[in-house]
Amino acid sequence: MKPMGGTELQMAYLQKFVDKELLDKVQITTSVPEKIPLAKDKPNILWQKNAWDQPNIHPWFKDKSNHSKYDWYVFNSHWNYEHYTKFFDLPTIKCVVIKNGIDNIPAREKPFHPKRDKCRIIHHCTPWRGLNVLLGAMELIKDPMIELDVYSNCEVYGKDFAEANDPSYQKLYDQAKRLKNVNYIGYKSNEYIKRHLKDYNMFVYPSIWEETFCISLLESMAAGLFCITTNYG
């Protein structure tokens, strides 16, 4: 299974909607500088979606001699752009912001009546971004009309990544399985999630991770869900 996180989803959209001949005229590297060799015969673009302080990114940007290697730096949010230009003095003349995009997601049609309907909550983020906080909150909730479905593990970044990292979060998965008001489902594809967002009333994401542009939140908002999250990032 290939990784299909936010970066991969955005690249798939780009390849779907932009003419291949045009894309072939540039070389686009996503997030990690020089993970593919720089092209000598076409413009080099670094499409930056990761936060400025990531250990596989920070040292490269801190060395200003690297800044001339790319012709353009494209950021997925103004927040991300501002951090890179502030902390690394990246030349703004080479920087541009193109925000993340999503498919057209039909909004849920059935109205939610809190006194009559069960409140169905979805959480579909990686486990290190606040799942521990959310499960702690669910332990305190005693109302039987509130139920959480958790689509969270490391498989979104591929099976090799999951095998190496899922054991670190097994206690969280076990906690989710023990709670009566939580259904631990694990990984489902982005297409599956988008099809089923209409079945939920609320998306809850108590992020402890600095998001650069949260796609899961954007999709949930587009589907008409009530959304609760932090302003971290």
Q: Each PLM stretch: what is its role?
A:
Residues 71-85, 90-108:
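Donor nucleotide-sugar binding/catalytic pocket of nucleotide-sugar-dependent glycosyltransferases
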Residues 226-229:
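Short hydrophobic beta-strand element within catalytic cores of glycosyltransferases
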Residues 194, 217-222:
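Short alpha-helical segment that forms part of, or immediately flanks, the ligand-binding pocket
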Residues 113-130, 135-139, 149:
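Conserved donor-binding/catalytic core segment of Leloir-type glycosyltransferases
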Residues 27-56, 67, 71-75, 96-99:
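Active-site proximal beta-strand in glycosyltransferases
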Residues 195-200:
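Short alpha-helical donor nucleotide-sugar binding micro-motif in glycosyltransferases
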Residues 162-191:
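Nucleotide-activated donor-binding/catalytic signature segment of Leloir-type glycosyltransferases, i.e.
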